[in-house]
Curated annotation (Swiss-Prot):
Annotated source species: Mannheimia succiniciproducens (strain KCTC 0769BP / MBEL55E)
Pfam name, any one: Ribosomal_L18p
Gene giving rise to this polypeptide: rplR
Quaternary data: Part of the 50S ribosomal subunit; part of the 5S rRNA/L5/L18/L25 subcomplex. Contacts the 5S and 23S rRNAs.
Gene Ontology CC, one term: cytosolic large ribosomal subunit
Entry keyword Membrane: no
Protein name: Large ribosomal subunit protein uL18
Amino acid sequence: MDKKSARIRRAARARHMMRENGVTRLVIHRTPRHIYAQVIAPNGSEVLAAASTVEKAISEQVKYTGNKDAAAVVGKLVAERALAKGIKDVAFDRSGFKYHGRVQSLADAAREAGLQF
């Protein structure tokens, strides 16, 4: 099993548990250059709020889009958008990535902005 398939397997196991519990989830995806965050409805069919470093407003705020500072900006923005729609409790779906670095920075910023997970 290679590194990518192991990550996908971890992510599938976590998502299965979240679907069974029927909770709204904050899903992240990480690439070397960008980070994406989405708040997804419990049934998984609807994206309720989203933010990423691809957005022009965020990429203009930060010097480089693939670091912890950019992840913190994305975390704060996705939390603000979710709170504006009345969502404050979510489950954090890290998509099999380690809770370290950019993933941790995004999660901490979302918590500071008011999301509960």
